[in-house]
Design a protein with these regions (language model features):
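Binuclear metal-ion centers of metallo-dependent hydrolases, dominated by the metallo-beta-lactamase
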Residues: 1, 56, 61-63, 84-143
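Core dinuclear metal-dependent hydrolase active-site scaffold
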Residues: 1-60, 64, 136-143
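Loop/turn elements at helix/coil->beta-strand transitions in domains of secreted/extracellular proteins
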Residues: 5, 39-41, 66-70, 95-97, ...
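A short, flexible beta-alpha/helix-coil linker loop
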Residues: 14-15, 77, 105-106
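Short, solvent-exposed loop/turn segments at secondary-structure boundaries
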Residues: 19-23, 82, 111-112
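Active-site neighborhood of phospho(di)ester-bond hydrolases with catalytic His/Asp-centered motifs
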Residues: 43-50, 69-76, 99-104, 130-133
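Short, solvent-exposed loop/turn segments at secondary-structure junctions
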Residues: 52, 79-80, 108
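Generic structural signal for short, solvent-exposed loop/turn connectors between secondary structure elements
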Residues: 77-79, 85-86
Length: 143
């Protein structure tokens, strides 16, 4: 049983836009969530801006909630989302313990191998893992 659960809403793109990325208000309502339940805190990134890790206004509110695990949207070549290195920078900046990729196996023409994402993480830092499509994990005992 989960007992009580709390969900915090955080921005995935700067709330005032990003002129360098040609993102103007109001096209900034992209959200992420930090969900806390049963002593575990999970960050679901939503569709973050490619330069998420460079925006303290995005990183710090998530980091302040001290999530344990992050489900991070990323892509190796599509500039809408953080590239693999940007995803690593997100995880490090937030202070995550474990990370899993999101949006792989979602789009036929934009698919990627999540093992390539995993390989980008340094030995010191968040531990990456892949949740196979249409499956699940039990955290933290499943890692």
């Amino acid at each position: 049983t989960l007992g009580s659960m709390t969900a915090h809403v955080v921005y995935a793109k700067p709330s005032d836009g990003d002129p360098d990325a040609d993102i103007a208000p109001p096209d900034v309502t992209h959200l992420g969530y930090v969900v806390q339940a049963a002593g575990v805190s999970v960050y679901v990134s939503g569709d973050p801006i490619n330069t998420f890790a460079e925006h303290d206004s995005l990183v710090l509110p998530v980091a302040d909630l001290e999530p344990d695990i992050g489900l991070l949207t990323n892509h190796p070549t599509e500039g809408e989302f953080p590239f693999f290195e940007g995803s690593v920078d997100m995880a490090l900046g937030i202070g995550l313990t474990h990370v899993a990729p999101a949006h792989y196996q979602c789009f036929v023409t934009r698919n990627y191998d999540p093992a390539e994402w995993v390989a980008c993480f340094p030995d010191e830092g968040p531990s990456p893992f892949v949740i196979p499509r249409n499956s699940h994990i039990v955290y933290p005992s499943g890692l």
